DNA sequence: ACGATTTGACCCGC
DNA sequence: GCGGGTCAAATCGT
């Protein structure tokens, strides 16, 4: 039995992530007792930064699996190699989840979307769960081969709580837009829509190291990094007015490791990045709470 | 007419 | 065999 890629490398990542998360937690603590607006802002940045970095690493590791192992399916085929299909096995995809709460007062008809357009492709009753789980994938899966997917499930007890788990990395052009539209409009020339994630991941990691020291007073530290962070759903959610970021995000890799974090976050970001750049407030997968429409979102398929 | 959603069937890993 | 995830035909909405 061997793991996907050098476990030493993974160990390193794991440690790094761990540190980052602890760091984030500390900031979150401070955030709670921070009095001045400035301090809070600063701390918020820090917190996001920690998460961002962690995710970047997670994503990076996910890609690593795919590339170096040409599929990353740990077992079942040891001598069987699919021709150059980087058909990322789901297992090796980066994955994280977060809880989102629908603000009671806010109109439920507002859109909560994480900036991407999703298409629902399935719904399933989950054992022990009161509500069904919705399965979504990126609208551009077919056209652009974007593999990102997510699952949305309403919490048993608290109907105002949604648990969303994301998988895979957005490689669609939308990824470039989301990441930049929302935080701040300072695109860099390198943000072409053509970049594949494999490159982006690495670049991102590198960039991050530079930019971590460079962000000035951008609204969000993440703004400067390309594509990748679009997967940072947690922050995308924070920006929404109707949904409060609930303060719990967990990342997990395939290697049986998972890290959970809870913190008292009060997302207060404002801007407006929705899937449709201009008009139609496309319903979000999360909030259709009609008896008829458990979730909005997308549904779709693939040959 | 076309794209999105619904929903039962199918597939696959445990 | 069971449960979770995906497919794809039918249906719905625009």
Curated annotation (Swiss-Prot):
Annotated spans, Disordered: 65-92, 266-291
DNA-binding region range list: 107-175
Gene Ontology biological process: leaf senescence; response to hydrogen peroxide; response to ozone; response to salicylic acid
Induction behaviour: By salicylic acid (SA).
Compositional bias of kind Low complexity: 266-278
Keywords: DNA-binding, Nucleus, Transcription, Transcription regulation
UniProt GO MF annotations: DNA-binding transcription factor activity; sequence-specific DNA binding
Cellular component, GO annotation: cytoplasm; nucleus
Subcellular localization, as worded in the UniProt entry: Nucleus
PANTHER family: WRKY TRANSCRIPTION FACTOR 30-RELATED, WRKY TRANSCRIPTION FACTOR 30-RELATED-RELATED
Subunit field text: Interacts with WRKY53, WRKY54 and WRKY70.
Recorded family membership: Belongs to the WRKY group III family.
Full protein name: Probable WRKY transcription factor 30
Species whose genome carries this gene: Arabidopsis thaliana
């Amino acid at each position: 039995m061997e793991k996907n890629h050098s476990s030493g490398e993974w160990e390193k990542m794991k440690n790094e992530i761990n540190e980052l998360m602890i760091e984030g937690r500390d900031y979150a603590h401070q955030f709670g007792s921070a009095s001045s607006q400035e301090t809070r802002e600063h701390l918020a940045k820090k917190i996001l930064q920690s998460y961002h970095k962690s995710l970047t690493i997670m994503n990076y590791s996910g890609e690593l699996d795919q590339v170096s192992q040409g599929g990353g399916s740990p077992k079942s085929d040891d001598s069987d190699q699919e021709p150059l299909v980087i058909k990322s096995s789901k297992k090796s995809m980066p994955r994280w989840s977060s809880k989102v709460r629908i603000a009671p007062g806010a109109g439920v008809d507002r859109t909560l979307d994480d900036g991407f357009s999703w298409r629902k492709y399935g719904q399933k009753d989950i054992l022990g769960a009161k509500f069904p789980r919705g399965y979504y994938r990126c609208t551009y899966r077919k056209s652009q081969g974007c593999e990102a997917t997510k699952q949305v499930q309403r919490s048993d007890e608290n109907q105002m709580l949604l648990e969303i788990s994301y998988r895979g990395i957005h490689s669609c052009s939308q990824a470039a837009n989301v990441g930049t539209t929302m935080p701040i409009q300072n695109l860099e020339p390198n943000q072409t829509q053509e970049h594949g994630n494999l490159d982006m991941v690495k670049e991102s990691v590198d960039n991050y190291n530079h930019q971590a020291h460079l962000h000035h007073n951008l609204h969000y530290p993440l703004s400067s990094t390309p594509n990748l962070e679009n997967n940072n759903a947690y922050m995308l959610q924070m920006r929404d007015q109707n949904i409060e970021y609930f303060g719990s995000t967990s990342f997990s890799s395939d290697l049986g490791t998972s890290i959970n974090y809870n913190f008292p976050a009060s997302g207060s970001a404002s801007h407006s990045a929705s899937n449709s750049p201009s008009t139609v407030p496309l319903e979000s997968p999360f909030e259709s709470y009609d008896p008829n429409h458990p979730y909005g979102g997308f549904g779709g398929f693939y040959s």
